[in-house]
């Protein structure tokens, strides 16, 4: 049987998408591979951690995951709000390597650059203890728990944290070609072992019949 299932947090390939709220974590110290985005379930307040960086804004301007969960991306001061304010026309969003988010807006005919928040990265001293909850999300335990040893460096490029790459996503770190080759090798080994067992059974059966 399978003794255990462990998560591999080594960095995957970075793929440029051109979408301004596609964010990848690049660099950082292994085995943490640069940290995790922190997201929250707005219905329950529960926190989760993920390397997936595909986001968009909802009608309220909050940055949320593009999947069906719609978890809110956390900044240094809570959920990030990157929508235009009253009277503004949003022209562009810029996420710096250190996580600072600047918005280029037009108000009353003037283009203005304003800081809108800071993307939060979270890292752990023992990420192998993060609890997998599915769909690329992980939990650090129940409220008040710290089962994976959260570190006090919540900023990109600080400590073991990586930097933020805007307009890009991190792809899976699984090499499908190697995994399929490994699976076929193991399958053939299993089949060979099964044939050995079958042959041994046949020889034993013949020996028993001869004795009779």
PLM region spans:
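Amphipathic alpha-helical polymerization modules
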Residues: 1-77, 81-84, 88-212
